[in-house]
C-alpha cells in the first residue's frame, strides 16, 4: 500500500481540483446584475484571473523568493499579489546581508486587503522572517481563505541538516502549526526531518521517505512533496 501513497494523494488533489473547476463554471453561469459605473471599490477590483498571494521576501542578490516566484507564476497566467516579509540585500546564504523586517507593514497590507474585500484563489507562503510573521500568516489564511481556495506552504527552515541563519527552534514550532492549514507543502529533506522532530540523515531509502511523507501528511497537508532528494 505504501507504493501507492503518492498516487493516492495525487488522485485526491485531482478530485479536489475538478470539484473546484465545476464550482467555478457553475458560478459563471449564474445571471449577473447590470454593470454599474466603474469605481475603485473592492467589488470592482475583482476579476476572473486567479489571484495568488505570495508571502515571501525580496532579495536583491540571488535569484530567489519573490524575484523567482513573480515571473514564474505570472507566465502561467496568474495575478501574483506579493505580501513581502522582508527586504534583503542578498539571501541569507551570503556571508553578509542587510535585512529590513516588514512585519508591521504586513499587518497594514492585510488590513487594507480586508477593506478592499479582495479574494485570493491560492495562498503560497515561503520565507518568513520570524515566528510572529508565521502567526500573522496563519491568521491571514484563516480569515481570507474560501472553501475551495488552496494553501501551498514552502516551509523554509534550512538545508544540509542545519537551520538557515536567523531561523530558530521557535520558528520550527510555528511552522509545524502553519502546515496544518496547507493542502500542499514542499519541504526539502532537512525541513522534512525538522518538521517530524527526527534526526537528519543524508541518505534515506524509498521506504523510509514514503513513511516520512505519510506521517507528515497525517498532520494536515494532503500532499507532501519532498525536494532535494
Where are these predicted regions, by residue range?
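Pocket-edge positions in alpha/beta enzyme catalytic cores
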Residues: 5, 98-101, 201
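A non-catalytic, amphipathic alpha-helix used as a structural packing/dimerization or gating element
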Residues: 8, 12-15, 105-108, 177, ...
